[in-house]
Amino acid sequence: MAKLLSFSNESRESLERGMNALADAVRVTIGPRGRNVVLEKSYGSPDIVNDGDTIAKEIELADPFENIGAKLIQQVASKTKDKAGDGTTTATVLAQAMVEEGLRNTAAGASPIELRRGMEKAVAAVVASLNQRSQSVSGDAIRQVATVSSGGDEEVGRMVAEAMDRVSFDGVITVEESKSLATELEVTEGMAFDRGYSSPYFVTDGDRQICEFENALLLLTDRKISSVTDLVPVLETVQKSGSPLVILAEEVDGEALATLVVNKNRGVLQVAAVRAPSFGERRKAALADIAVLTGGQVISEDRAMTLDKVTMEDLGRARRITISKDSTTIVASDDSKEAVSARVASIKRELDNTDSEYDQEKLNERIAKLAGGVAVIKVGAPTETELKNRKLRIEDALNATRAAVEEGIVAGGGSTLLHISAELDALTSGLEGDQKTGVEIVQRALSAPLRQIAENAGSNGDVVVDRVRNSGEGFNALTGNFEDLMNAGILDASKVVRLALQDAVSIASLVVTTEVVVADKPEPPAPAGGGGDPMGGMGGMDPMGGMGGMGMM
């Protein structure tokens, strides 16, 4: 494909235009009085959302150079979302402010490399101060963090706090759509473990990069599956039932994995493969625990069982299974409580009979996974559009509270970053030239989140920033008052603030040091014309491997 090239200031300015286009769409959502953004969908009704990462992913610009700038901001939002689960809009606002200041200085002749070094020194100093200010989570702080992260929704804050209280900070909490209008909390039998899908082609939700099945069947085995021949009978049976299938095995690879992927993507079979948790004998124990939870059998040579003899009665059943790239959550049906209780009692007896600290630790982990259960927040709303928006807010609140448990909390509303900015004066006094300017770029950008929160609340951003800087207090955008935000319960997770800043500086420093941008040259639109599907139709299972009537061999 032919390429387009852009050089020097022209290249950086085109990147900035693209970054500004996306950032301006995202920044209106920050704070408790942030606005919504309407996203047109290729099918169905539009989405009305308040989530920075979701908005960023939907934006693509016509100009190829500007679109690269937009993709860079998307990367900021995506990285922050992946690592912290929240703070995407804060990261976007910070990155935009730093890029604007940085490019203004490079255009005036500043050294991009020295600017970057100064910016890196500044962010290190801010992170150190942030860690000193951070306080551990206690009392009502969980509810307050969740409320702030969900845009001031008190009900969401209360529900997230209750869910964490019911299953502990380390417990499994999931969010699903409710059949009713009400949003409810339910604690049910379930389990989570650190193993993800064997192939990204199993993903069913591209936005969240997860595979999610309702009322799924589970094939549990401690064997490695490479040949699809072993799976033919059970796959034929499952396809006739119309239920999704998740295969938990030592490993699924080769012909077996390729065939599953192809037929899943053709819509012939809803299927996913996951590597079983743990190793060796502990893997067998983990699979046995999952079998008890789901009412299935572990297909094992130790029990003289083979895959080609599997029946529907041997398969486990789960109300819902959610699989990400590195974790799996199983929500069991309600009729597994007695079996789980008996299994937990059996493991406790085993615990009483061992003196090994390592074995005791692993047995306690198994008990916690089985007995802890899964808290399910069922989200209800009058319309599908409102339901999606509310679900995103609850997921943000959950992620923020988990981050708060990890690294503590600081005063929210953008006030902490603004107050820390004053401490950078000591750093600039020991520097000179463009490194000093790099520190000042970050220092000025630290006021951007508070300024935008104030403007979204209908206040003058510059006036609010000056008053907060001089008073030492914070701005409560919900009430319009200036007060101690820690006492008012306006809290941010330290981890979210830290990662938002670090990711913003990372991208901004790269843009400042950019000299050339290379983009794909847009191809002219193809002439209109007919033609059949180049795939040639589904025709049942893919010929890579067949399955009786479905074409598998």
UniProtKB/Swiss-Prot annotation:
Signal peptide: none annotated. Its EC number is 5.6.1.7. Disulfide bonds: none annotated. GO terms for cellular component: cytoplasm. ATP binds at T29, I30, G31, P32, D86, G87, T88, T89, T90, G413, N476, A477, L478, D492. GO terms for biological process: protein refolding. One of its GO terms (molecular function) is ATP binding. Together with its co-chaperonin GroES, plays an essential role in assisting protein folding. The GroEL-GroES system forms a nano-cage that allows encapsulation of the non-native substrate proteins and provides a physical environment optimized to promote and accelerate protein folding. Belongs to the chaperonin (HSP60) family. Forms a cylinder of 14 subunits composed of two heptameric rings stacked back-to-back. Interacts with the co-chaperonin GroES. This is Chaperonin GroEL 1. It comes from Synechococcus sp. (strain CC9311).
